[in-house]
Swiss-Prot record:
Residues 1-54 are annotated as: Disordered. It comes from the Eukaryota. The active site is at S223, D323, H355. Substrate binds at G151, G152, A153, Q222, S223, A224. Keywords: Endoplasmic reticulum, Golgi apparatus, Hydrolase, Membrane, Transmembrane, Transmembrane helix. This is Probable isoprenylcysteine alpha-carbonyl methylesterase ICME. The chain crosses the membrane at residues 90-110, 145-165. The gene is IMCE. It is a multi-pass membrane protein. InterPro entries: AB_hydrolase_fold, BD-FAE-like_dom, GDXG_lipolytic_enzyme. It holds the Pfam family BD-FAE. One of its GO terms (cellular component) is endoplasmic reticulum membrane.
């Protein structure tokens, strides 16, 4: 398969953007509707005040998605064949999930029943073009917004994986939009990046309708989602610097947070193969070996002109030093390349933390979460009132027993 452009230029238009960082741009805009806290948009609805979906439509969508996931699972099994690595990884994943199930159940209850969660808001016309919104309770002013692209090895990503992060940030006055996207084999990397870009465009254009501040939009991705979001960001910056028509502007993004991401996938093919993501599957996801440089943000960043680099927002890369799914050197090297190119890049390493410690085990443990605090410190850097509230914020309670978390840490397939 030939390399495809990672983002689509014909996604929905955007709302009024922040002042540009120095490049011409052609933004396509559409009407948005002011936010009304008394009448939140229903799950399954479109943004901008469009028609809400009916119960029958929701049931029909759920049935169609279930059928689709089942069919794609069998297709994926044909790709995987019988291999001890992925079978052992699957077994470890099942045990890992059972150990953390008490926490997952409590987060799931919040996800399905909290009035602060708007599930399956439609952002595009492709399958799985939906996102979940986590809305702060009783906001007194427009809230900062984080557009979050979930991980999942490009195969098992799902918007609900961001529920715990969404809850924690919403409790601190930040709106979170968890963007779903087509996974493999339903789509390949260009589809994933295109979906993510369309989701970001939707957030930028409708943020005001949900009580968000259009001048405080942040982009974040975790694991494969960090890679996808970085691809979308760099491609959008390149298109913007060339003066092409765009559906959202990188100048609307105040900062990008990349958590446990891989940014030079050319260097990770063999590593992933040893971890159970077989080379043949990974190259199919990435649309062939020739496409690897095109979808490696680190490689792309080396070739960007100074005008494009100047458009990029602050980039914050976060990684655990004991991450064996994606070594922390991936973030370390990418940060160095960005700095050398003139970008504003910052690297935060979490000593002794694995791929899932930072994102799952630590938040389930309760107490002050280092990752959440680091992200909030960037978002609230210019808001003295918010920082005062952060200092007095309630400490989250424990969701899973310590022995279960420690055992899950040892068994985790990630």
């Amino acid at each position: 398969m030939q390399p495809a452009s990672p983002v689509s230029g014909d996604a929905g238009p955007v709302a009024e953007a922040v002042p540009p960082r120095g490049a011409p741009q052609v933004l396509v805009r559409r009407r948005s509707v002011p936010f009304s806290p008394d009448s939140p948009l229903a799950p399954g609805s479109r943004g901008g005040g469009e028609r809400r979906s009916t119960f029958r439509e929701d049931v029909s969508h759920a049935a169609a998605e279930t059928y689709l996931v089942t069919r794609l699972a069998f297709i994926l099994l044909r790709y995987l064949g019988v291999g001890y690595r992925w079978i052992s990884q699957l077994a470890a994943l099942i045990i890992y999930a059972i150990l953390l199930m008490p926490g997952f159940i409590r987060v799931g209850y919040y996800y399905f029943f909290s009035r602060q969660v708007l599930r399956s808001v439609i952002y595009g016309d492709q399958p799985r073009n939906r996102l979940d919104l986590y809305i702060p309770r009783d906001p007194k002013k427009p809230s900062p917004v984080v557009a979050f692209v979930t991980g999942g090895a490009w195969i098992i990503g799902y918007k609900a994986w961001g529920a715990l992060l969404g809850r924690r940030l919403a409790e601190r006055g930040i709106i979170v939009a968890c963007i779903d996207y087509r996974n493999f084999p339903q789509g390949t990397i260009s589809d994933m990046v295109s979906d993510a870009s369309d989701g970001i465009s939707f957030v930028c254009e409708t943020v005001g309708a949900y009580g968000g501040d259009p001048n405080q939009i942040y982009l974040m991705g975790q694991s494969a989602g960090a890679h996808i979001a970085a691809c979308a960001l760099l491609e959008q910056a390149a298109k913007e610097s060339r003066g092409e028509q765009i559906s959202w502007s990188v100048t609307q993004i105040k900062a990008y947070f990349g958590l446990s991401g891989g940014y030079n996938i050319e260097n990770l093919v063999d590593h992933f193969h040893e971890r159970g993501l077989y080379r043949s599957i990974f190259l199919s996801i990435m649309e062939g070996k020739k496409s690897l440089p095109h979808f490696s943000p680190e490689t792309v960043a080396k070739k960007l002109c100074p005008e494009t680099i100047a458009l990029l927002p602050q980039i914050v890369l976060l990684h655990g030093t004991d991450d064996y799914s994606i070594p922390f050197s991936a973030s370390e090297t990418f940060a160095g390349v960005l700095k050398q190119a003139g970008a504003k890049a910052k690297l935060l390493l979490y000593e002794g933390k694995t791929h899932t410690d930072v994102f799952l085990q630590d938040p389930l443990r309760g107490g002050r979460d280092k990752l959440v605090e680091d992200v909030i410190s960037v978002i609230h850097a210019d808001d003295a009132d918010a920082r005062e509230k952060d200092a007095l914020a309630p400490i989250p309670g424990r969701l899973v027993s310590e022995w279960q978390i420690k055992l899950a840490h040892r068994i985790s397939p990630f």
